[in-house]
């Protein structure tokens, strides 16, 4: 037990931290400030919690998010009063939308110093609107055991709310009166006997995992539909292999193709799933193929994929749509005829029955998808193997084949995630992809990736120049970083994703206000933050630098590409590749 009896604020804060430790907290991110002094001391001095000081609140919050994404355990964040907590807001939004557990402790002035121009005091009650799972203001610390019992149980409840019913943010607003520093208040020593023998904390234990509620049988509608598809969307499962195996089991039972997003681990466990389809975005650009492959049933697992082609296709068709999702969220942006199964894919128990046995016969529907997917993949491989110049789209394709097994990779938003969707190859490397696809912003990209990589296996980040520039304060984490992160920087001097949109035809407005080139010398930026830097000259060099990955530190490998040339190449590739596939429409119609 680690309690600090120097004064009422240190005792109050140490009860918070000891309760969190017993619940399972291991990491706290501390931003500097005066009003939060008691909390900072309590976290920093606890022997079993790693407390990391980070200057910039926005970067600190995204770093905490990255840690929580990987561990799927709440990370605590602490800041002082005033605008400090407002800098956590983008992370709160992303955590809510991507279902990541976080605990926020914003220190505050007591009620008598609010709304009276006392300084560094804003209205922090419900600071984050409706985004937290739960939010509360704690009582003013006072030497009463009834209040300490209230504090313990409130922290336990907050921990639970960060997990259930869906993982997310819990916000504790924490008012403190003076003294903020650990100045001795002798009368507090009288409370020591109330905390002896560990009885105060004996009921504080880690949460028990959710009991699995099995689906006793598949919905009968599924067993009668021959032309079904399974969509494996964005997902960060706690056990990637178990998750991928569960999807494979369902797909094998139903003989359905599995259209798999690059931000799902399913593409990286290809040996588990013979029904894997990864080229659906390109396939659906061939309107004849898309028409002939119309499904009568869609089963969605995870969030909807990045692919706009897939969205448009299903929005037009309006098939019966089932979503497997344990949360209470509305996960259907298409507003289809949707039925929800509120459970996890791992919960399915597939019963043997005559109906299923009949379903297990070889499906011509599945075979058609597999043949087309294989042909398109062969075209992709032939095309990219012949590309000898530095091309943005080839980077994802190469990474999917050369990264060491089980490498965590953080893929930035905008073009990085889309190139992965187009070109990330199915493999058996068990690579674990991470992303910020809750709100899809580029803010906090570097900091989140550093959090993902903190005390983890050597990791990789794939990003464009603007996403990295937007979060360069993340490099201030470097002195406290433990682990390794290789940053593969695609520098095309601007927002390449806008080159794919109609606005790209409207110059000079486009270049100044949308592409927004920054003309930054990244080698000089790296010198400022003492980050090792290398400029990539050719493809063999990047492969050599990634096999194996270093064990510690941060480094940047810069791949300079031509934004205009990349966009022309990609537009041509996307429009022509599926059309080159030789597959007769009569065969599709028969299937």
From Swiss-Prot:
Reaction(s) this enzyme catalyzes, per UniProt: isochorismate + 2-oxoglutarate + H(+) = 5-enolpyruvoyl-6-hydroxy-2-succinyl-cyclohex-3-ene-1-carboxylate + CO2
InterPro entries the record matches: MenaQ_synth_MenD, MenD_middle, THDP-binding, Thiamin_PyroP_enz_TPP-bd_dom
GO MF terms, alphabetically ordered: 2-succinyl-5-enolpyruvyl-6-hydroxy-3-cyclohexene-1-carboxylic-acid synthase activity; magnesium ion binding; manganese ion binding; thiamine pyrophosphate binding
Keyword Manganese among UniProt keywords: yes
Record carries keyword Transferase: yes
Keyword tags: Magnesium, Manganese, Metal-binding, Thiamine pyrophosphate, Transferase
Pathway it works in: Quinol/quinone metabolism; 1,4-dihydroxy-2-naphthoate biosynthesis; 1,4-dihydroxy-2-naphthoate from chorismate: step 2/7; Cofactor biosynthesis; phylloquinone biosynthesis
UniProt enzyme class: transferase
Subunit record text: Homodimer.
Database matches in PANTHER family: 2-SUCCINYL-5-ENOLPYRUVYL-6-HYDROXY-3-CYCLOHEXENE-1-CARBOXYLATE SYNTHASE, PROTEIN PHYLLO, CHLOROPLASTIC
Function text: Catalyzes the thiamine diphosphate-dependent decarboxylation of 2-oxoglutarate and the subsequent addition of the resulting succinic semialdehyde-thiamine pyrophosphate anion to isochorismate to yield 2-succinyl-5-enolpyruvyl-6-hydroxy-3-cyclohexene-1-carboxylate (SEPHCHC).
Protein family (similarity comment): Belongs to the TPP enzyme family. MenD subfamily.
Name of protein: 2-succinyl-5-enolpyruvyl-6-hydroxy-3-cyclohexene-1-carboxylate synthase
Organism, scientific name: Rippkaea orientalis (strain PCC 8801 / RF-1) (Cyanothece sp. (strain PCC 8801))
Gene: menD
